[in-house]
Every structure is written in C-alpha cells, then in structure tokens.
C-alpha cells in the first residue's frame, strides 16, 4: 500500500470542544478498495484522548498500542507521550520503516506526530492528514472561520471530511466521528 493513499483524518478544537473524524476506506494498491468501514479514529486513555491515523493499517495498530503505552507511562500527559513516541519511532530501526502519521488530541492540546520526529501543534486548532488532508483542512478552516458561531466542533469535523470525500478518490463517506467534551 502506498503511504497515506487510503484515508483522511481531520481534527478540530472549537468553542471548548474537540472532535476528530476519519473516513472508512482502506485501499489496496492504487486500484482496489478493500474495506469501506475501517475505524481509523479511536478513543484512548479511558476516553480522554482521541487518536487518528493515516497510512498502513498494520503500522497504525502498532503505533496506537505504543502511544497508549506512552500515555499510561506519562499519566496522560499528551505532549510528553507524543514526544517520547516520536523519539522512539524515529530512532528505532524497525519502527523507522513504519508508514503512518498520527493526529492525537485531548481537551486542551492537538498534535501531529510523525516517524521523522516531528510533533507539531497547529496555531489554529485544526489538523488534517492523509490523501484528502489538504481538502479537509481547507474546508475545516473555512467552516471554523466563517460559520464557526453556528457550528460545533463535531459539525465542522463531519462537514470537512464529507467535503474531502467528495474530492479525494481515496476518501469515502463512511465517516467515523469522535468528540471530547
């Protein structure tokens, strides 16, 4: 599977709420849709953290497990767990080959974590990854900026992914949506 050509993950913090959405499509190679309802967004750490992945499915399961272990080790400190995961991911010979990216968030913090060691916190409370990430990011920013008073974080996350799914062939309309309150 080519890296990141199988999904879109979008996350937003808005009006004191945090929401993350992901599509359900799993693509094998460049031409075959293998699954329509994969769950790429999950609640972790007793429902206090959301995590979403783009990339190889097997790699993502490994990273979810590692990230949850880091959350436990650092008592739910999202930034510390993310930095430690990125350090281990970048420095380990086997893990370095994993083809995935993660978005993680709690009520206060939103982060992008990658295998090259980046842990990035956006300025505007919005992140998107995957093949449809740029479409979702653009839609989400427009929605938050121009309709934010009338929409919840959950509404923005759902609409941004729906728009990305209408444009990106690797993103479908089987949206998984999680929210932290």
UniProtKB/Swiss-Prot annotation:
Documented EC number(s): 3.4.21.-
Keyword Protease applies: yes
Principal localisation: cytoplasm
Molecular function (Gene Ontology), one example: serine-type peptidase activity
Protein location: Cytoplasm
Enzyme class: hydrolase
Assembly and binders: A double ring-shaped homohexamer of ClpQ is capped on each side by a ring-shaped ClpY homohexamer. The assembly of the ClpQ/ClpY complex is dependent on binding of ATP.
Gene: clpQ
Protein role: Protease subunit of a proteasome-like degradation complex.
Recorded family membership: Belongs to the peptidase T1B family. HslV subfamily.
HAMAP family: HslV
UniProt lineage: Bacteria, Bacillati, Bacillota, Bacilli, Bacillales
Pfam families registered for this protein in UniProt: Proteasome
PANTHER family: ATP-DEPENDENT PROTEASE SUBUNIT HSLV, METALLOPROTEASE TLDD
Protein name: ATP-dependent protease subunit ClpQ
Catalytic residue positions: 2
GO cellular component term, pick one: proteasome core complex
Keywords: Cytoplasm, Hydrolase, Metal-binding, Protease, Serine protease, Sodium
Gene Ontology BP, a term: proteolysis involved in protein catabolic process
Residue positions binding Na(+): 165, 168, 171
């Amino acid at each position: 599977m080519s890296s990141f050509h199988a999904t879109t993950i979008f996350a937003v913090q808005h009006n004191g709420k945090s929401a993350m959405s992901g599509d359900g499509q799993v693509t094998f190679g460049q031409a075959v849709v293998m699954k329509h309802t994969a769950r790429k967004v999950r609640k972790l750490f007793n429902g206090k953290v959301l995590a979403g992945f783009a990339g190889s499915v097997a790699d993502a399961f490994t990273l979810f497990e590692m990230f949850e272990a880091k959350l436990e080790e650092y008592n739910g400190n999202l930034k510390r767990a993310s930095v430690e995961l990125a350090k281990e991911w970048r420095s380990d010979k086997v893990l370095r080959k994993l083809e995935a990216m993660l978005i993680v968030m709690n009520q206060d913090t939103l982060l992008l974590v990658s295998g090259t060691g980046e842990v990035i916190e956006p300025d505007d409370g919005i992140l998107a990854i995957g093949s449809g990430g740029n479409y979702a990011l653009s839609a989400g920013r427009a929605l938050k900026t121009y309709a934010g008073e009338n929409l919840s974080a959950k509404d923005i996350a759902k609409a941004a992914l729906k728009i990305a799914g209408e444009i990106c062939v690797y993103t479908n309309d089987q949206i998984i949506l999680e929210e932290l309150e």
